[in-house]
Design a protein with these regions (language model features):
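Short alpha-helical hairpin
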Residues: 83-95, 273-283
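Bacterial Sec-dependent N-terminal signal peptides
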Residues: 1-29
Length: 340
């Protein structure tokens, strides 16, 4: 039987503070980012003349059109299939496109935030090929919120950024795909964060150790490493956006940091590999049921982040690339994390 965590509610009003590192000057890092509004081109096509309209669309958007039709819409690469399925998608999603026009009429503030993030990427990873295009699109609701395309563009699916209260997100069909604890993050402010998360995932895929993490503690530190790098790319972005927690959940986690760690230790969870045991602590959810109503889902990310911060304080000459390449088990053992 697991020992329960007990946290007095009055403790949870305190806001934890992370030790802020000095933010480097990245003003000299050159970023050339062009925003391409693919959804405007797509929803301007003449559906009564699909072959020529699609050909014109291909001509204007050579790089992204193929990704959109074949990978995002999942249409077989045959002319008749593309024309038929694209027309069906057009009629099904034109109302969602209409809903996106006003909130994204001026995309410059979002582009500027993405550009700032890319400057930090270029500073910390000078050999990383920075994306030169930011492509917006409207895709299926069960498709991507954002991806890095094969031609190294950042693509953003606006259908998943129309605001947490958008009526379509309240339908039973969409709630089955995206419960409210997920759709509350369907806000435009998450676009720069998710663009940087895609780059973080790309960096980890290229640089992480070959040994797969299986123990809970390794998986938590894996997530903590990603969050630490994300913070480096977005130093001025609100913590709640980067963690995906509500501000109250984040404050609660800092306030109960010692109790959270004690729970994992006393219940012998750190070295567990059984997915049914590990999953509740490293997957998204409205809360971590085992800890209580006050907690966020994916609490393992928070714990791993604190461990990584502790290790980096002891190894302040270590680069972010070296952090990524260092085995998570090694980071845990060397950090000697023990919150007070």
């Amino acid at each position: 039987m697991k020992k329960k965590i007990r946290v007095c509610l009055f403790v949870l009003v305190f806001v934890g503070c992370s030790h802020k590192k000095k933010v480097p000057d990245v003003s000299q890092i050159k970023v050339n980012l062009q925003t391409i509004r693919f959804e405007k081109d797509f929803f301007s096509i003449d559906t009564n003349n699909m072959p020529s309209s699609l050909q014109a669309l291909y001509t204007r958007n050579k790089g992204f059109s193929q990704d959109f039709f074949f990978n995002i819409l999942g249409i077989p690469p045959f002319p008749d299939s593309v024309a038929h399925d694209a027309k069906l998608f057009f009629s099904t999603y034109k109302s969602i496109y209409a809903s996106s026009v006003q909130p994204f009429q001026n995309f410059e503030p979002i582009q500027e935030e993405v550009e700032k993030g890319l400057q930090f990427v270029g500073f910390y990873f000078p050999k990383y090929p920075l994306p030169t295009k930011l492509v917006t699109f409207i895709g299926p609701l069960n498709s991507y919120a954002g991806i890095i395309t094969p031609d190294n563009s950042l693509a953003v699916g606006l259908q998943l950024y129309l605001g947490k209260d958008y009526k379509v997100y309240q339908s039973d069909e969409v709630l089955n795909m995206y419960p409210s604890y997920v759709s509350r993050r369907f806000e435009p402010a998450y676009i720069p964060v998710n663009c940087m998360k895609n780059i973080v995932d790309d960096l980890f895929a290229s640089n992480k150790p070959s040994k797969k993490s299986t123990q809970l503690i390794e998986q938590m530190v894996d997530e903590g490493k990603k969050l630490y790098v994300l913070y480096a790319f977005l130093p001025n972005t609100p913590d709640s956006l980067k963690t995906g927690y509500t501000q109250q959940q984040l404050s609660n986690s800092f306030a109960a940091e010692k109790e959270i760690w004690t729970y994992f230790v006393e219940n012998d969870l750190l070295y567990q590999t059984d997915p049914t045991i590990v999953s509740p602590y490293v997957n998204d959810g409205p809360k971590t049921t085992e800890l209580g109503e006050w907690s966020p889902g994916n609490i393992g990310q928070f714990v791993g982040w604190q461990i990584v911060k502790k290790w980096m304080e002891k190894n302040d000459k270590v680069s972010l690339q070296q952090l990524i390449q260092t085995p998570s088990k090694q980071i845990f053992e060397e950090a000697r994390y023990k919150p007070h």
